[in-house]
Protein backbone atom coordinates (compact mmCIF):
# COMPACT_ATOMS: atom_id res chain seq x y z
CA UNK A 1 0.00 0.00 0.00
CA UNK A 2 2.96 2.32 0.66
CA UNK A 3 4.90 1.25 -2.42
CA UNK A 4 4.52 4.60 -4.14
CA UNK A 5 5.36 6.75 -1.08
CA UNK A 6 8.69 7.64 0.34
CA UNK A 7 9.21 7.15 4.07
CA UNK A 8 10.57 10.69 4.45
CA UNK A 9 7.41 12.15 2.92
CA UNK A 10 5.27 10.16 5.33
CA UNK A 11 7.25 11.40 8.32
CA UNK A 12 7.06 15.01 7.11
CA UNK A 13 3.31 14.74 6.75
CA UNK A 14 2.92 13.31 10.24
CA UNK A 15 5.14 16.04 11.75
CA UNK A 16 3.19 18.78 10.00
CA UNK A 17 -0.07 17.33 11.28
CA UNK A 18 1.21 17.19 14.87
CA UNK A 19 2.51 20.75 14.70
CA UNK A 20 -0.84 21.92 13.42
CA UNK A 21 -2.50 20.41 16.50
CA UNK A 22 0.02 22.13 18.81
CA UNK A 23 -0.32 25.60 17.30
CA UNK A 24 -3.51 26.57 19.18
CA UNK A 25 -2.01 25.31 22.45
CA UNK A 26 1.16 27.35 21.89
CA UNK A 27 -0.88 30.46 21.13
CA UNK A 28 -2.96 29.90 24.27
CA UNK A 29 0.21 29.43 26.34
CA UNK A 30 1.65 32.68 24.98
CA UNK A 31 -1.60 34.44 25.84
CA UNK A 32 -1.55 33.14 29.41
CA UNK A 33 2.12 34.09 29.78
CA UNK A 34 1.39 37.63 28.61
CA UNK A 35 -1.54 37.90 31.03
CA UNK A 36 0.55 36.61 33.95
CA UNK A 37 3.26 39.12 33.12
CA UNK A 38 0.72 41.94 32.99
CA UNK A 39 -0.83 40.91 36.30
CA UNK A 40 2.64 40.73 37.84
CA UNK A 41 3.39 44.26 36.63
CA UNK A 42 0.06 45.49 38.01
CA UNK A 43 0.69 43.76 41.35
CA UNK A 44 4.14 45.39 41.63
CA UNK A 45 2.63 48.75 40.78
CA UNK A 46 -0.07 48.39 43.46
CA UNK A 47 2.52 47.34 46.04
CA UNK A 48 4.62 50.40 45.17
CA UNK A 49 1.52 52.58 45.60
CA UNK A 50 0.80 50.98 48.98
CA UNK A 51 4.39 51.66 50.10
CA UNK A 52 4.15 55.28 48.95
CA UNK A 53 0.79 55.66 50.71
CA UNK A 54 2.23 54.28 53.97
CA UNK A 55 5.19 56.65 53.77
CA UNK A 56 2.88 59.60 53.19
CA UNK A 57 0.89 58.75 56.32
CA UNK A 58 3.83 58.80 58.74
CA UNK A 59 2.99 61.09 61.63
CA UNK A 60 6.27 63.00 61.67
CA UNK A 61 6.60 63.50 57.91
CA UNK A 62 5.22 67.04 57.86
CA UNK A 63 6.79 68.09 61.17
CA UNK A 64 10.37 67.04 60.39
CA UNK A 65 13.15 69.47 61.22
CA UNK A 66 16.80 69.87 60.30
CA UNK A 67 19.66 71.33 62.31
CA UNK A 68 22.75 73.37 61.51
CA UNK A 69 25.49 74.70 63.74
CA UNK A 70 27.97 77.55 63.35
CA UNK A 71 30.69 75.33 64.84
CA UNK A 72 31.88 71.72 64.89
CA UNK A 73 32.11 71.92 68.69
CA UNK A 74 28.52 70.68 68.95
CA UNK A 75 25.77 69.22 66.82
CA UNK A 76 22.14 68.40 67.44
CA UNK A 77 19.43 65.95 66.51
CA UNK A 78 15.70 66.60 66.78
CA UNK A 79 12.36 64.86 66.92
CA UNK A 80 9.41 65.95 64.81
CA UNK A 81 8.06 68.06 67.65
CA UNK A 82 11.06 70.39 67.87
CA UNK A 83 10.28 74.08 67.45
CA UNK A 84 12.07 75.93 64.66
CA UNK A 85 14.31 78.71 65.91
CA UNK A 86 17.84 79.77 66.83
CA UNK A 87 19.73 79.10 70.05
CA UNK A 88 22.90 80.77 71.31
CA UNK A 89 25.21 78.16 72.83
CA UNK A 90 28.64 78.28 74.43
CA UNK A 91 30.46 75.22 75.81
CA UNK A 92 33.08 75.86 78.49
CA UNK A 93 33.79 72.28 79.60
CA UNK A 94 33.24 68.76 78.31
CA UNK A 95 32.19 65.87 80.51
CA UNK A 96 34.93 63.33 81.03
CA UNK A 97 35.43 60.03 82.82
CA UNK A 98 37.78 59.64 85.74
CA UNK A 99 41.06 57.79 85.28
CA UNK A 100 43.15 56.60 88.23
CA UNK A 101 46.74 55.44 87.78
CA UNK A 102 48.95 53.73 90.33
CA UNK A 103 51.70 55.93 91.73
CA UNK A 104 54.14 53.06 91.96
CA UNK A 105 55.20 50.93 89.02
CA UNK A 106 55.91 47.21 88.81
CA UNK A 107 58.97 45.72 87.11
CA UNK A 108 56.71 43.39 85.09
CA UNK A 109 53.04 42.58 84.63
CA UNK A 110 53.22 38.92 85.69
CA UNK A 111 54.59 38.98 89.25
CA UNK A 112 52.09 38.72 92.12
CA UNK A 113 51.78 41.82 94.30
CA UNK A 114 49.72 40.40 97.19
CA UNK A 115 50.71 37.64 99.59
CA UNK A 116 47.13 36.89 100.64
CA UNK A 117 43.76 36.59 98.96
CA UNK A 118 41.99 39.94 98.85
CA UNK A 119 38.89 41.83 97.78
CA UNK A 120 38.90 45.05 95.73
CA UNK A 121 35.76 47.16 96.19
CA UNK A 122 34.76 49.91 93.77
CA UNK A 123 32.33 52.54 95.04
CA UNK A 124 30.93 55.24 92.76
CA UNK A 125 29.41 58.49 93.95
CA UNK A 126 26.28 58.02 91.84
CA UNK A 127 24.39 55.92 94.37
CA UNK A 128 25.03 52.60 92.68
CA UNK A 129 25.84 49.60 94.85
CA UNK A 130 29.56 48.94 95.40
CA UNK A 131 31.08 46.14 93.33
CA UNK A 132 33.61 43.77 94.88
CA UNK A 133 36.18 41.81 92.89
CA UNK A 134 37.91 38.78 94.41
CA UNK A 135 41.65 38.53 93.81
CA UNK A 136 43.64 35.47 94.83
CA UNK A 137 47.22 35.96 95.95
CA UNK A 138 48.42 33.85 93.04
CA UNK A 139 46.45 35.98 90.58
CA UNK A 140 47.43 39.39 91.98
CA UNK A 141 49.79 40.42 89.20
CA UNK A 142 48.94 43.45 87.07
CA UNK A 143 47.63 41.12 84.39
CA UNK A 144 45.56 39.10 86.85
CA UNK A 145 44.08 42.21 88.49
CA UNK A 146 43.29 43.79 85.12
CA UNK A 147 41.53 40.70 83.80
CA UNK A 148 39.52 40.15 87.00
CA UNK A 149 38.31 43.77 87.03
CA UNK A 150 37.33 43.74 83.37
CA UNK A 151 35.29 40.57 83.85
CA UNK A 152 33.42 41.95 86.86
CA UNK A 153 31.32 44.70 85.23
CA UNK A 154 32.35 47.01 88.04
CA UNK A 155 31.66 50.27 86.21
CA UNK A 156 35.34 50.66 85.37
CA UNK A 157 37.85 49.27 82.90
CA UNK A 158 41.43 48.37 83.77
CA UNK A 159 44.52 48.54 81.59
CA UNK A 160 48.28 48.22 81.97
CA UNK A 161 50.53 51.09 80.90
CA UNK A 162 54.14 50.49 79.90
CA UNK A 163 55.82 53.68 81.10
CA UNK A 164 59.24 52.64 79.78
CA UNK A 165 62.45 51.32 81.31
CA UNK A 166 60.70 48.05 82.16
CA UNK A 167 58.13 49.74 84.39
CA UNK A 168 54.37 49.08 84.35
CA UNK A 169 51.45 50.87 86.01
CA UNK A 170 47.81 49.92 86.45
CA UNK A 171 45.18 52.33 85.12
CA UNK A 172 41.49 52.34 86.10
CA UNK A 173 38.94 54.34 84.04
CA UNK A 174 35.24 54.86 84.80
CA UNK A 175 32.92 53.65 82.06
CA UNK A 176 30.67 56.71 82.46
CA UNK A 177 31.51 60.40 82.32
CA UNK A 178 30.53 62.91 84.98
CA UNK A 179 31.59 64.00 88.44
CA UNK A 180 29.13 61.65 90.17
CA UNK A 181 30.69 58.65 88.44
CA UNK A 182 34.07 59.10 90.13
CA UNK A 183 35.06 56.01 92.12
CA UNK A 184 36.90 55.17 95.29
CA UNK A 185 38.83 51.91 95.64
CA UNK A 186 39.40 49.94 98.83
CA UNK A 187 41.29 46.68 99.27
CA UNK A 188 40.76 44.23 102.12
CA UNK A 189 42.82 41.15 102.89
CA UNK A 190 46.25 42.36 101.80
CA UNK A 191 47.97 45.54 102.94
CA UNK A 192 50.48 45.54 100.08
CA UNK A 193 47.71 45.59 97.48
CA UNK A 194 45.84 48.28 99.44
CA UNK A 195 48.96 50.45 99.46
CA UNK A 196 49.45 49.82 95.76
CA UNK A 197 45.97 50.69 94.46
CA UNK A 198 43.78 52.04 97.25
CA UNK A 199 42.06 55.38 96.55
CA UNK A 200 39.74 57.03 99.08
CA UNK A 201 38.19 59.58 96.72
CA UNK A 202 40.27 62.53 97.92
CA UNK A 203 42.79 63.31 95.21
CA UNK A 204 45.08 65.26 97.55
CA UNK A 205 45.45 62.45 100.13
CA UNK A 206 49.07 61.31 100.08
CA UNK A 207 48.13 57.89 101.47
CA UNK A 208 46.37 56.93 98.24
CA UNK A 209 48.08 54.31 96.13
CA UNK A 210 46.57 55.81 92.98
CA UNK A 211 46.51 59.32 91.59
CA UNK A 212 43.72 60.92 89.59
CA UNK A 213 45.35 61.34 86.19
CA UNK A 214 42.05 62.41 84.59
CA UNK A 215 39.45 64.18 86.72
CA UNK A 216 35.81 63.15 86.58
CA UNK A 217 33.84 66.20 85.51
CA UNK A 218 30.51 67.33 84.08
CA UNK A 219 29.87 69.17 80.86
CA UNK A 220 29.22 72.89 81.35
CA UNK A 221 27.52 75.10 78.81
CA UNK A 222 25.17 78.03 78.38
CA UNK A 223 22.06 77.97 76.20
CA UNK A 224 20.58 81.41 75.58
CA UNK A 225 22.73 82.55 78.53
CA UNK A 226 21.25 79.94 80.90
CA UNK A 227 23.85 77.79 82.71
CA UNK A 228 23.52 74.04 82.17
CA UNK A 229 25.56 71.24 83.73
CA UNK A 230 25.31 67.60 82.68
CA UNK A 231 27.20 64.40 83.42
CA UNK A 232 27.22 63.48 79.73
CA UNK A 233 28.28 65.14 76.49
CA UNK A 234 24.99 63.95 74.99
CA UNK A 235 22.32 66.18 76.49
CA UNK A 236 18.68 65.38 75.78
CA UNK A 237 16.93 67.19 78.64
CA UNK A 238 18.05 70.80 78.17
CA UNK A 239 16.02 71.77 75.10
CA UNK A 240 12.64 70.20 74.39
CA UNK A 241 12.80 67.59 71.61
CA UNK A 242 16.44 68.51 70.86
CA UNK A 243 19.49 66.42 71.75
CA UNK A 244 22.82 68.25 71.93
CA UNK A 245 26.03 66.37 71.15
CA UNK A 246 29.08 68.15 72.55
CA UNK A 247 32.42 67.56 70.82
CA UNK A 248 34.61 70.40 72.08
CA UNK A 249 34.57 73.70 73.95
CA UNK A 250 33.53 76.71 71.90
CA UNK A 251 35.20 80.02 71.23
CA UNK A 252 32.57 82.41 72.53
CA UNK A 253 28.91 82.09 71.60
CA UNK A 254 27.84 79.91 68.69
CA UNK A 255 24.48 79.42 67.01
CA UNK A 256 22.30 76.33 66.65
CA UNK A 257 19.57 76.72 64.03
CA UNK A 258 16.49 74.50 63.85
CA UNK A 259 14.47 74.73 60.62
CA UNK A 260 11.46 72.92 59.23
CA UNK A 261 12.55 70.21 56.79
CA UNK A 262 10.10 69.88 53.90
CA UNK A 263 12.35 67.74 51.69
CA UNK A 264 11.15 64.41 53.12
CA UNK A 265 7.51 65.41 52.66
CA UNK A 266 8.15 66.58 49.09
CA UNK A 267 9.92 63.33 48.22
CA UNK A 268 7.11 61.25 49.74
CA UNK A 269 4.43 63.24 47.90
CA UNK A 270 6.22 62.88 44.55
CA UNK A 271 6.61 59.13 45.11
CA UNK A 272 2.88 58.87 45.92
CA UNK A 273 1.82 60.82 42.81
CA UNK A 274 4.11 58.76 40.56
CA UNK A 275 2.87 55.48 42.05
CA UNK A 276 -0.77 56.58 41.78
CA UNK A 277 -0.40 57.55 38.11
CA UNK A 278 1.32 54.30 37.22
CA UNK A 279 -1.18 52.07 39.02
CA UNK A 280 -4.14 53.99 37.51
CA UNK A 281 -2.69 53.69 34.00
CA UNK A 282 -2.00 49.97 34.34
CA UNK A 283 -5.37 49.27 35.92
CA UNK A 284 -7.17 51.07 33.09
CA UNK A 285 -5.28 49.12 30.44
CA UNK A 286 -6.37 45.79 31.95
CA UNK A 287 -10.07 46.50 32.34
Where are these regions (language model features)?
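Single conserved hydrophobic/aromatic residue that forms the stacking wall/gate
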Residues: 278, 282-287
